[in-house]
Structures are given as structure tokens and as C-alpha cells.
Amino acid sequence: MSEIIQDLSLEDVLGDRFGRYSKYIIQERALPDVRDGLKPVQRRILYAMYSSGNTHDKNFRKSAKTVGDVIGQYHPHGDFSVYKAMVRLSQDWKLRHVLIEMHGNNGSIDNDPPAAMRYTEAKLSLLAEELLRDINKETVSFIPNYDDTTLEPMVLPSRFPNLLVNGSTGISAGYATDIPPHNLAEVIQATLKYIDNPDITVNQLMKYIKGPDFPTGGIIQGIDGIKKAYESGKGRIIVRSKVEEETLRNGRKQLIITEIPYEVNKSSLVKRIDELRADKKVDGIVEVRDETDRTGLRIAIELKKDVNSESIKNYLYKNSDLQISYNFNMVAISDGRPKLMGIRQIIDSYLNHQIEVVANRTKFELDNAEKRMHIVEGLIKALSILDKVIELIRSSKNKRDAKENLIEVFEFTEEQAEAIVMLQLYRLTNTDIVALEGEHKELEALIKQLRHILDNHDALLNVIKEELNEIKKKFKSERLSLIEAEIEEIKIDKEVMVPSEEVILSMTRHGYIKRTSIRSFNASGVEDIGLKDGDSLLKHQEVNTQDTVLVFTNKGRYLFIPVHKLADIRWKELGQHVSQIVPIEEDEVVINVFNEKDFNTDAFYVFATQNGMIKKSTVPLFKTTRFNKPLIATKVKENDDLISVMRFEKDQLITVITNKGMSLTYNTSELSDTGLRAAGVKSINLKAEDFVVMTEGVSENDTILMATQRGSLKRISFKILQVAKRAQRGITLLKELKKNPHRIVAAHVVTGEHSQYTLYSKSNEEHGLINDIHKSEQYTNGSFIVDTDDFGEVIDMYIS
């Protein structure tokens, strides 16, 4: 044989070969046939077991024998893949109705591997034989196997709609399928209604076939998703576990899971829930136990006393496979091609297959009945001239001669003559003559009935309906999955996710934030906080891990940070910079921080800028679900900075102090509530080149402490302040000097909580007691504290 060498481009060869491969795995491996709901390997397994007599009424046989038969005759692939497919057909948590019964370890819902095939035994289930019934009556086409040594069926007769009953899942080149299992009785009832009315709508079909019926039970939510899937082949539903509540003797409650979503690994689910408990992602779970035994699936989740079990359940629905979404993708092979099919198309394809199967079976039975009728007529004729027939046979030389003589003398046909010469003597009694005449009548009636079925389409459909009803009556079972119309919205209480713990929140002027246990704080003291050189504590307070921190910056933005998301860091150690939690700009600095326990409050924030703008916004506006980026708190115009954020429970007085020593005091009731993106209104009427250095709440018992650039501190009492209206110029608090005038660089309202001050110059920090600063009159410049000739001008002041 001479070689033929072709020059082909690699691109063409790869494209051609991959196209062939794709077609093969689509048609011959991964996708089920719409007619019998089986993939090729599943079909070959069932047929091999049936043809070898490994049926439900016989003894179990070693699985290895079946696997050997399949790969030897029909499926030349690895034995493991065949055994794996065989095992799946026996798993009652995968199939709604198992097609193979298996003795031995056939795996588990924990995804444990089955025992080796040499240890397990199997046989066809009774229902599986309904897929194969009448296969020997020329009902389906056969094709040569892979080595042309025998024949295998292209499809099984499938006397019930197996694709819908047991569903299918698979992935091939460019296609995937996910068809859920359904209740057999419901599917058959829907098929019967479709036979009666081929124009039946999906809505009408759904009166009979309610939705998927998973072997693992569970609760299905979302009728709209089911309807969409039944109409188009694609849809989405929610499947959640069945969870009940029990009360233990000690008064604690426990959640008992008895049904889990389809295809969920039970051991992985238990492990996941226990991880959520161990990692303290959910507070309130004491222990998770897998109590599954021979009586059924059971997972126990023991809860702490007085916890909200409904919230725990909702958290687990959202954060574990206690609830999953199932996506329909009903792709099957139809007319040799993969198609996305709705439920009407699937039932229609199945019905057309059954029409063909029943018609072929009827033709086969009619042919056999007519052949038998012909033989019976010959036997009856022979018995009517028995003596002559016997005499002719006795005078014949041999069997062949006898047959030829019968045909020639009495005009019997070849088939009739063969039956006569094979007739045994004991059959020549009167009883057998009567039996033959009775059989003749029965055959006449049968032939008439079979011809009627072939000639009358309605009669053929009635046969299909009768046989489907028989299967329904024999194999029907109660629905396992409960269907709920709406998808329930999951609401999770924060208390469930986060253990309640009182901690110390701290923020430094350079933006380092942390939470610290009260134990660590008490062991160290405020002064021992971990700081970088040049940094100082801006604020510290006791908060709860279930609170939320709002961090406000000079750009008019705020960061929304749940306290429990802050790193738990010892008091003596450096905190975490806010930019590592939420990204902020390089020149963006923190100006204040507050914690909120409940955003449902009448409290409000007041924002004041350097250029004299002010606004008020209620606390509920700041609640959000976005943690990953800064959010707008107030609009800050170009060349301006937010310098003050205050939180008030009710309207009160605020004082504004400017760089040139002007002061204006008015009530926040003059401010209207505005949205977060508003810029606000004018707070004070500034002089040229003046700017605001302080805006803070003030009361009658407070004093004001001011620092000037020349190192002077001035302290005044509340009575010097004159309450006025917003947007006025205000009063003067400094004595104006022609040469080197004092300018206020920092000011703070001093309350009973404050006792110390710190002045910052370019190269020095000066600490002192606030009470050592005597109260001044309105038109003075205070007392010199810092020698600016030695340490430079004062740039800031901090009180504590």
C-alpha cells in the first residue's frame, strides 16, 4: 500500500480535528438525548446489563463484570469513567429515581468515593427496565458498535420521560446542560395533558408539573424563574435547606437541618458552617454536629442562649450552601444537534419518540401475529385431513420429501409444511384442535386491534396514554421538594455577624486608626499610645464592635468603617493608616471621627470650612453599604478645606473664630437640613484675607482657648461672646497692633473634660495646664508662652 502525503497548514488541521472532536463530545459524550434522557455511556451501561440478563428479578452481579461488558463491547474508554457513571445511576441523592440498584458502598452525599468495582454488586432497577421495555421488538434503530462486532441501540425506547424525571448535567465543547429532576407522576400527568391538547401553554402545564423535585428535597423559591426556564430553557431559582428549630433541656435552641440543596456536599457544608463559627464571622453558634445516620440526614447547629435563631439562619443562608441558586440550562441532543429547549419542546420530542416506538412495536407485533395466523390456519387444515396427511408423510422418503409432498398435494405453504412436519404426535388430540381454533380467533382480534392502532393516530396515542398511566400508578411517589412562589429577601442583623464587645477606638492626627481591647488600654494608659514621631492623639473613646466609625476628611468626604473591620491592635503599638482600609488622596487629612450605634436618630452633623461655609445634615443620610471608597459628606469648593465636623443631638450655640480674631456665635437652628452634596451657606462675613480657624459648639460654662502665631495663649469666658445671627461679621477678640499683629492659628472650646494644652511650633512642643492660663478681657492678646525667636512661630494647638 503506497503512502499518500499531504501538505496541510497546522491551522487547518487543528481547526478540522478540533471540530470533529467537538462534535464527538457534544453528540457522543456530554449531552443527553432528549428522547431517553441518557448520555451514550449511561445508555450503554443499561443496555449491557439488560442484554446480559442483569435485571431486577435476578441476583446482583459484580459491578466489574458490567464495566467489562460495557468497555469490551460498546464503550472503549477507561473503566473508571464507566464505573463512575454506573455508580451515579445508583445514587438516590443524585437521581430522583435510581436506574441501578447497588449493593455495597456506592459513595455518599459527603462525596466519599465508592468502593472499588470488584467489591460492589449491581442490577437494573425495575423502573430502568421501563426504559428498555420492547427494545427487542424493533422499536429503535441499532448501529454497529465501535469494532463492528455487534449492534447497540441509538436510543432506548424510554417508556417514561426520563430526561425530566432524572434530569441531567454535563459540560462539552461550547455547551453545558443543567436539567433538574422532577416528580415522575407530575411529569407523566403533564405529558398526558399535552397529548390531549398539543396547544397547551406553559402556564397550563405548570398546573400539573409544579417545578423541579430534587431527590434531596429542600425548599424551592421563585415560580417566575421556573416559568422562565420552562418557556425558554434558561431560568434561575433559589434552593434552600429545610431547617427546623428544637429546644434542648438546658433551654438552648438548636437548628436542625434535615434536607439540603441538590448537589451540595454535606460534609463541606458542615465544615463551612463550623469555620464561620470558629472565625467568629457569626456570633451565637456553640457547636455544629453532623448527626446523619441510617434514619436520614441530620445536621445540628447548637445556639447560645437568647440569640435570634432566625437571624443566624438567614446569615447561614447567605454565607454558606445552606441556600444556593440553581440555574436551568436545558440543553439536550435533538435531531442530532444540541438545542436549548423549553418544557413543551422536551415533551413534544419525547412524545414523537413514543409515537415512533409504539408504531414500530405495533408493526413488529402485527407481523408476528400474521405469521402465526398463517401457521395456525395451516395446522387447522392439516388436522381436518389428518389421515391423508399422516399417510403422505409415512410414504415420504425424508423430512424434505414430506414437506415437498405436502406443498404439492395439499397446497400448503413452505411455512405451514414446516410446522406440520415438526408437529408432535401428542398434539393431534381433540383438545389441541380446539385450542388452535381458539388461538385463531384471538389472533384475528389481535390483528384487527393492531391494524386499528396503525391506521388510527388517536388509537396509537391512547396506547401511549394507557402505558404512561400504568407506569405512573406503579412508580408514583410524593413530592420531596416544597415550592414557594416568591424568593425571600434575606435580612441579617448585625448582632449575628459581629460579637458584641466594648473596645477603645483611637485616631491620631496623622490618620492612624485602631481598636484596642479595654484590657490592653487599662494596662497601658492614654499616654503610652503607639505613635510616629511628630504625631499625636486626635481622639479616643469607648465604642462597641457593632458600631460604625465615620471618619471625616478635609476634602469634605467621609469613610464608613464598621468597628469590627478595624484591626485589633495593642494600645502601645502603631495603628493602621486609614488609607490602608479605604484609599484616600495623598493631601487628604483626617479632621474628626465619630461612632454611630444606630443611624435611626434625630442627631445631625454640622460641617464648617476655612472659607466660612457651613451646613447641617441629619445622621441617617450617612448610612451606606459601601465600604470600599470615600463618600461625599459635603461639597467643598476649590481653594477651600473642611476644618470642623460637629455632631449634635439637638440645636445649640456654635462659635466661629477667624485668623484675624473675629468671633461670631449663633444657634444651629438657623441652619436648614441639607443633603450630602450641598455646599451649605455662609457662616460668617469674613474680612479680606481672613479665614476661619475654629467652629465648635459652645455652652455657658465653657471657655475659649486661642493660640497666636507669636506664641501667645488667650483664654476667654463664654460671657464675652455675643449671640448674634448667622453671616454677620461678629466681634473682635484681639487687640490690633500695627507692627507684627497677632493672628489666631488655633482655637478650641474648653469644657470640663479638658485640662491640658499642647502648643506646636516648627521645632518644639510646649505642654501646660489650661487652668494656669488666666481668663482675659475681650481686647487683649493673651500671655506669651512660647519664645518664637528660639523655636519658631506656633502653628497648631491641641487640648486634652
Swiss-Prot record:
The record marks 39, 75, 77, 88, 94 as: Interaction with DNA. The record marks 118 as: Transition state stabilizer. One of its GO terms (biological process) is response to antibiotic. Pfam families: DNA_gyraseA_C, DNA_topoisoIV. It is found in: Cell membrane. The active site is at residue 119. PROSITE patterns: TOPO_IIA. Keywords: Antibiotic resistance, Cell membrane, DNA-binding, Isomerase, Membrane, Topoisomerase. It comes from the Bacteria. GO terms for cellular component: chromosome; cytoplasm; DNA topoisomerase type II (double strand cut, ATP-hydrolyzing) complex; extrinsic component of plasma membrane. One of its GO terms (molecular function) is ATP binding. SMART domains: TOP4c (SM00434). Its EC number is 5.6.2.2. Topoisomerase IV is essential for chromosome segregation. It relaxes supercoiled DNA. Performs the decatenation events required during the replication of a circular DNA molecule. Phe-80 and Lys-84 confer resistance to fluoroquinolones. This is DNA topoisomerase 4 subunit A. It comes from Staphylococcus aureus. The gene is parC.
